[in-house]
Amino acid sequence: QNPHFIRARPSLIAKARRADLIICSGAGLEVGWLPILVQKSGAAVQPGAVGHLMTSEYVPIIEKPTAIDRSMGDLHPEGNPHIHLNPHNILLIADELAKRLEAINPNNSKIFKERLLDFKTRWQKAITQWEQESNFLKGSAVVVHHKSFSYFIEWLGLNQVGSLEPKPGIPPTSLHLENLLQQLD
């Protein structure tokens, strides 16, 4: 499901009311529905509580605009929230998630620490393998549909030469696509 367009339906609100922890990307990605969900939820998942985890607060954010207006398209004022597309960010998030789980359920602290260590070992091994397998792509020119791939492009060392969207969130026109094709020739 596209996180830009999730709807805070009654079934989701009911689940949030029972939750000990809400995990979101943050950086404004969930701005259209998360405030309603949190407003109708319990104290455990309110902003500032241990059960309210905005993962973007624990990783380096890219593409933070210095100024913003609607003519620039659908930009995220807090920077690019698609942090999960750089696997190194997942390691940073895992550390914070384990801390939160330990705070919520201290009786299982040892298990959380063991599982974090196991996860980080396996994830780092996977990152190393992915980087080796994709090394030949470094510097390759790519065209994206949306700015959501910026972390991925940065991680793999790709070269974004264009975007199907003329501006973030703005559907492409035939003229824009024609110009993009000419640029790529």
Predicted region positions:
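Extracytoplasmic metal-acquisition and chelation regions
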Residues: 1-185
